[in-house]
Amino acid sequence: MSRLHATILTVFPEMFPGTLGHSLAGQALQKNIWSYDVINIRDFGLTKHKNVDDEAYGGGDGLIMRPDVLGNAIDHALSLNPRAKIYYPSPRGKVFTQGFAKEILRDIQLNSESFRQDEFKEEPAEHIIIREQRRMPQNSLVSSLLNDAVNMIFLCGRYEGIDERVIEEYNITEISVGDYILSGGEIPTLTILDCLIRLLPGVLMNQNTLASESFEKDGEFEGGLECGLYTRPEVWYNRKVPSVLLSGNHKLINEWKKEQSLMITKLRRPELLKDLRDKERS
């Protein structure tokens, strides 16, 4: 059984696995470290044309994905993965970060044991899922986003977006990948999954690599940006590798890397330093 399973609802099923079928994610897919299935929303469309959208109440440009169509597609997905939490890539959502990704995977791991214990409770598991999935308060903390899910469902919106009632009825968590607009939710879904997959045990050859990457608050750069990287040749277009990296003095090298990380972070992402100071004060 894979460690992470994603069910993807989309009107463009041919977009998956896409880039996730290559490189590290592709190898992990072949090893069954993660798995996925795709549900074509148009299979639940209306009329012979399989329509999935309609005009917006209240006017405005663009078409809205219908709640009846999406509801049927979601119900089908939940029948296959009843413990899944539903995610909707949206510019209104909480911004997806490295820390957010780690929280999601940690919650999956911590709650996998409780899933098995649920099987021994007298209350039918299906009843439990409906109550927790659809009636959980909308203001739940990020740390509880995946409290009930080993499986994930991604709802990929198109056109102007989806009917708000779908989000309310299924208690869908909206996730943003940044302050910009894309044509649909497929690319954000690929981005989110790629980040999650590479954090799974067995995907990276050396799991310690994660500690030396940008945004890792417990890592080498303490949540800042990674320093510049260098490899052979030693001189390229009259540009030399910094001499400290050739010295063999690991103490000096580590100090240089941290100084460079601090300088780059202060210049390009100063808010990350504020987050670090806030963490130290708490």
UniProtKB/Swiss-Prot annotation:
GO terms assigned for molecular function: tRNA (guanine(37)-N1)-methyltransferase activity
Domain of life: Bacteria
Keyword Cell membrane: no
SUPFAM superfamilies found in the cross-reference section: alpha/beta knot
Enzyme Commission code: 2.1.1.228
Location in or out of the cell: Cytoplasm
UniProt xrefs under Pfam families: tRNA_m1G_MT
UniProt binding sites for S-adenosyl-L-methionine: 157, 177-182
Protein name: tRNA (guanine-N(1)-)-methyltransferase
Taxonomic source organism: Rickettsia bellii (strain RML369-C)
Gene: trmD
